[in-house]
């Protein structure tokens, strides 16, 4: 049965060709009543088109606002075909008005046309594993859809009903996602593209997801994924036209397969272990010469991008389980506050940078890439906040160094584990790679302390064995060596066949079992040991048989430095007796506080030079500095000595003032004093490690003055000369008799605590690069002030100490200076009263609050004014003296108000006292009662 189109509101007003339609419509159509049984007033989403194009809607216009994972395309083939067919029709699609008024329209179409459309949809729709259900009832839920799936024996991966965000009501369509395309196709064919849910027919369509490659683009320079509207890369700033790279979604530039023998590795990264090399994949990012290293933002946190909005914590942990042991405390999924769905990224925080770098390298080396819930994951280092980026340049350099070496350490650990854990270095035909840029001169390990020094070491690949610097085929390691700095001074090196260092008191001695446990490489190949300088004779150890170690030569014997592998802190062994860490590869002892190495054989302190890749004695740079300065002239010496004496006196005065202020404090005086005889021998030893530790702290104040400065300090020789007279520290008191003696003996004693030639403070055991730094240390350092006070108290006798403590206790008490001043000068006489200018005025004091208590006198201003007009005292006012004689007195207001209130007062005035007022009140009440 064919239904005629009824005119809408626009047709009645003649908006869209009402005149033409009046010729087709008969009179009975205009007079026909509405048959509401044939009408469908449901407000489900529908599509309609108009010639103007301003009312073209499709299903995706309502789906895209709430859909996050299933982004339907705005124009599918079926919808475009329908639009073309509707445009060719002269009157538009049957059953749809042109003006948008569809309250009294019939939405049913002919059966033949509907079947034709269904056939076209079946032919033109592209199969997908996501099925869209349209025309759902308002009361339908996800459970109803799952019930339909279970009735057909189909297991769906996810069912999502689209709802209005504000009201929460169903929008009439839903999505069903299947794990496989075959399941979705089988379900569509079994139901003939329609379902019956809650007694209503529901249409089924394949979802046409929007290709995301048209939305985002990848930068072929840095590999960062950018938004579609971004015209240039937000990381490297390359324009989109130059840097756009058509790659599948989720594919990263650093995940492309490179040839196994490729040399284009990112600086600071080592090849992956053998299992990944077998697959032909190198986990390194190909960076251009101008690009920044990938370790710039390295930290202990990894970010996972391009996550499915419905991915949960369990799915992420399950996907990462084969690569790392993580818990829910390590993973943080960022969710939307309104929808409670994740925003497409998550963070993984590990305990150290090494673990994070290791996991990052593994995940980026996967082929195919990591996939979670059907989406390819992009893995990168997480960037810090803006306030973290605002750090100074020195800390950034140090952080970059630690991050680079951490990545190298992670890769080296993987490679060592894959090779069986024999502890041998990997042999290779390619030349050794230079990683000396890890060791920054000023930033290396200065601000990170002990923890950073554990990781801030590079790992060298390509050498024949640990510590081997010779050419291939030369087992003795005596082959030609290339120096990194041809013009640099040489340091003596000597190779020996077995590492068997001698032991000193408190120094670790390697046993024969420990030597043999290092593998066969330690026996067949040689180590290279530095010959450091002697710093202190007290550190000399008892002689032990050490014939395997030849005597060291002078530092100027060679012109090139022997190169060593970068120290591996993880292989060090802790020695409880000395407190140092023993390096079994080089036989040196490592101090983590100062980062110095100690050679027990030559009793020298060494430090690691990253540029030369060798161990340099601590005295080398200071000796060079003295050679360059040369011998000063005679006039320069005199000026220097004069300036030195003047500076010492100023420092002595400053320390004297500080000592006086220190006497006011009671705390830690007894604990700070320790006799010299009670100190242990090891506490009295001078150590260059303290110099390096203080240089790290001193670096913040004078960074420019401390470049390439050796932290050398000779020992304090015992002085056999008689000590100067001992006296008390000058106290803050004008009655101290020993103040003058202390002023004479103090500067001479303190002058001996400073070595102006070597620019060292012998009291604090510190050496400085310039005289200004030494003076600043003596004036401002709290450590120097504390050591100076301890040094002064150490030279006092017991009686002097008791007197000093007694004086300190007296100083801690309250001192009544006013009483002392009164006793000394007496009590001053009170000042004389001031003389008044006018003697005629009575000096009697008048209470300003009660001036008329005794009555009005004749000296007031009112009386004088009346007398000026002819009035005399005692007469009445007026022309004929008929007025009042006595002045009007002020009376208290009537107490009380309303009915029953007395009409008179008790005769009490405001000038009466409380006692007089009470007396008058009692008398008045008594009289009234009678």
From Swiss-Prot:
MF term (GO), any: zinc ion binding
Q: Which residues carry this modification: Phosphoserine?
A: 61, 89, 718, 723, 733, 736, 738, 781, 797, 845
Q: Name one GO biological process term.
A: positive regulation of vascular associated smooth muscle cell apoptotic process
Which protein is depicted?
RNA-binding protein 10
* Gene name of the encoded protein: RBM10
Q: Where are the zinc fingers (RanBP2-type)?
A: 212-242
Outcome after substituting residue 396 to H = In a colorectal cancer sample; somatic mutation
Q: Where is the composition biased (Basic residues)?
A: 80-89
- The signal peptide annotation in the UniProt record is none
Briefly state the protein's biological role.
Answer: Binds to ssRNA containing the consensus sequence 5'-AGGUAA-3'. May be involved in post-transcriptional processing, most probably in mRNA splicing. Binds to RNA homopolymers, with a preference for poly(G) and poly(U) and little for poly(A). May bind to specific miRNA hairpins.
List the biased-composition ranges (Polar residues): 508-524
């Amino acid at each position: 049965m064919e239904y005629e189109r009824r005119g809408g509101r626009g047709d009645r007003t003649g908006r869209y060709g009402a005149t033409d339609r009046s010729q087709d419509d008969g009179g009975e159509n205009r007079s026909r009543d509405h048959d509401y049984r044939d009408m469908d007033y449901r407000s489900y989403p529908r599509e309609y088109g108009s010639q103007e194009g301003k009312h073209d809607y499709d299903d995706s216009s309502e789906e895209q606002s709430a859909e996050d994972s299933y982004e339907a395309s705005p124009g599918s083939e079926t919808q475009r075909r329908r639009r073309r067919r509707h445009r060719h029709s002269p009157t538009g699609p049957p059953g749809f008005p042109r003006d948008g008024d569809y309250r009294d329209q019939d939405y049913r179409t002919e059966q033949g046309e509907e079947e034709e459309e269904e056939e076209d949809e079946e032919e033109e729709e592209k199969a997908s594993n996501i099925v869209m259900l349209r025309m759902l009832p308002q009361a339908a839920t996800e459970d109803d859809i799952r019930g339909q799936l279970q009735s057909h024996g189909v297991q769906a991966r996810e069912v999502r009903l689209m709802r209005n965000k504000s009201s929460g009501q169903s929008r009439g369509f839903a999505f069903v996602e299947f794990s496989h395309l075959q399941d979705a196709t089988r379900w569509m064919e079994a139901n003939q593209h329609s379902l019956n849910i809650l007694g209503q027919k529901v249409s089924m369509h394949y979802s046409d997801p929007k290709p995301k490659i048209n939305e985002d683009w990848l930068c072929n320079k840095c590999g960062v994924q950018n938004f579609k509207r971004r015209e240039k890369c937000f990381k490297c700033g390359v324009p989109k036209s130059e840097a756009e790279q058509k790659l599948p979604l989720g594919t990263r530039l650093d995940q492309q397969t490179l040839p196994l023998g490729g040399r284009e590795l990112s600086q600071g990264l080592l090849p992956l272990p053998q299992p990944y090399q077998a697959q032909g994949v190198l986990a390194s990012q190909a960076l251009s010469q101008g690009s920044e290293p990938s370790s710039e933002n390295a930290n202990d946190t990894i970010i996972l991008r391009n996550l499915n909005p419905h991915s949960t914590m369990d799915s992420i942990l399950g996907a990462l389980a084969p690569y790392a042991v993580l818990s829910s405390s390590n993973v943080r999924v960022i969710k939307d506050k309104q929808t409670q769905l994740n925003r497409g990224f998550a963070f993984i925080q590990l305990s150290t940078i090494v673990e994070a770098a290791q996991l990052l390298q593994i995940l980026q080396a996967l082929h195919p890439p990591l996939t979670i819930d059907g989406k390819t994951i992009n893995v990168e280092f997480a960037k810090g906040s803006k306030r973290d980026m605002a750090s100074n340049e020195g800390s950034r350099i140090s952080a970059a160094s630690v991050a680079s070496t951490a990545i190298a350490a992670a890769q080296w650990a993987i490679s060592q584990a894959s090779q069986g854990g024999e502890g041998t270095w990997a042999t290779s035909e390619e030349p050794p790679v230079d990683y000396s840029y890890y060791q920054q001169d000023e930033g290396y390990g200065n601000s990170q302390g002990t923890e950073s020094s554990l990781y801030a070491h590079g790992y060298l690949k390509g050498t024949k064995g640990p510590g081997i610097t010779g050419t291939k085929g030369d087992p003795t390691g005596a082959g030609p060596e290339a120096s990194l700095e041809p013009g640099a001074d040489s340091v003596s090196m000597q190779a020996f066949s077995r590492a068997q260092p001698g032991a000193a008191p408190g120094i670790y001695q390697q046993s024969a079992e420990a030597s043999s446990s290092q593998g066969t490489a330690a026996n067949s190949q040689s180590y290279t040991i530095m010959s450091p300088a002697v710093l202190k004779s007290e550190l000399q150890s008892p002689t032990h048989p050490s014939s395997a170690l030849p005597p060291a030569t002078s530092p100027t014997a060679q012109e090139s430095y022997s190169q060593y592998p970068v120290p591996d802190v993880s292989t060090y062994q802790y020695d409880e007796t000395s407190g140092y860490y023993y390096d079994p590869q080089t036989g040196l002892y490592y101090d983590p506080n100062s980062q110095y190495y100690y050679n027990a054989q030559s009793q020298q302190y060494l430090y690691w030079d990253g540029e030369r890749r060798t161990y340099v004695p601590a005295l080398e740079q200071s000796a060079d500095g003295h050679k360059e300065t040369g011998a000063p002239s005679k006039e320069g010496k005199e000026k220097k000595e004069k300036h030195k004496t003047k500076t010492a006196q100023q420092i002595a005065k400053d320390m004297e003032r500080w000592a006086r202020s220190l006497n006011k404090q009671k705390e830690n005086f007894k604990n700070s004093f320790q006799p010299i005889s009670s100190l242990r021998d090891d506490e009295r030893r001078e150590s260059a490690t303290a110099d390096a530790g203080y240089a790290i702290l001193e670096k913040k104040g004078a960074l420019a003055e401390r470049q390439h400065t050796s932290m050398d300090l000779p020992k304090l020789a015992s002085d056999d000369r008689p000590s100067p007279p001992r006296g008390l520290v000058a106290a803050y008191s004008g009655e101290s008799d020993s103040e003058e003696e202390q002023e004479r003996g103090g500067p001479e004693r303190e002058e001996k605590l400073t070595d102006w030639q070597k620019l060292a403070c012998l009291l604090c055991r510190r050496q400085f690069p310039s005289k200004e730094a030494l003076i600043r240390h003596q004036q401002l350092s709290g450590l120097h002030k504390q050591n100076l006070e301890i040094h002064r108290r150490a030279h006092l006798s017991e009686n002097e100490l008791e007197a000093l403590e007694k004086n300190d206790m007296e100083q801690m008490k309250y001192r009544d200076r006013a009483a002392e001043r009164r006793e000394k000068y007496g009590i001053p006489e009170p000042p004389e009263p001031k003389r008044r200018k006018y003697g005629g005025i009575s000096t009697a004091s008048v209470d300003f609050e009660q001036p008329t208590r005794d009555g009005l006198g004749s000296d007031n201003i009112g009386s004088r004014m009346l007398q000026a007009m002819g009035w005399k005292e005692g007469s009445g006012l007026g022309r004929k003296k008929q007025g009042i004689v006595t002045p009007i007195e002020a009376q208290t207001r009537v107490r009380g108000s309303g009915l029953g209130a007395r009409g008179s007062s008790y005769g009490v005035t405001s000038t009466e006292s409380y006692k007089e007022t009470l007396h008058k009140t009692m008398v008045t009440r008594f009289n009234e009662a009678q």
